[in-house]
Amino acid sequence: MKVPVFQLSCLLCLIVCLLCSVKAQKDDQYDTEKSRILEIYNNPAVDEFTKERNIPKLIEFYRRYPARIQLPDADKRQWDEFVARYTESQTKLVDGLPAQGGWVGSVLSSTVGNLIAKFIFSLIRYDPTTPKPTGAH
């Protein structure tokens, strides 16, 4: 059975269009999630409690888009260590709930806070689609 070239061309075009729309959808999802993260962590008006409460979303974003986040090797190792330590702390239960306080308390005023700042900076610096803060050079 011969399939006309025209039908094969149409099928190929359809496949390419579907693949492009899936990629565009993933880019939109990345941009939306990145915007939410930046609204929280790149905004001085957001309080520390809100930032700490959103650390799981920050970690999830990092795990979902590792290739899009460009951290120097040393920062990446530190970030991976932080993620492992944070995840471990959340799995330890006290009376059926994750432990409160501990090393995560006041996380944003510590070395981990600096690491999160580097992570956010990498989202802004290395992604040309990220709007720069007013007055930035």
Curated annotation (Swiss-Prot):
Keywords, ordered alphabetically: Immunity, Innate immunity, Secreted, Signal
GO cellular component: extracellular space
Subcellular location: Secreted
GO biological process terms on file: cellular response to heat; innate immune response; response to bacterium; response to heat; response to oxidative stress
UniProt protein name: Protein Turandot X
Family statement drawn from the similarity comment of this UniProt entry: Belongs to the Turandot family.
Keyword Transmembrane among UniProt keywords: no
Signal peptide: 1-24
Source taxon at top rank: Eukaryota
Function summary: A humoral factor that may play a role in stress tolerance.
Pfam families reported for this sequence: Turandot
Stored InterPro entries: Turandot (IPR010825)
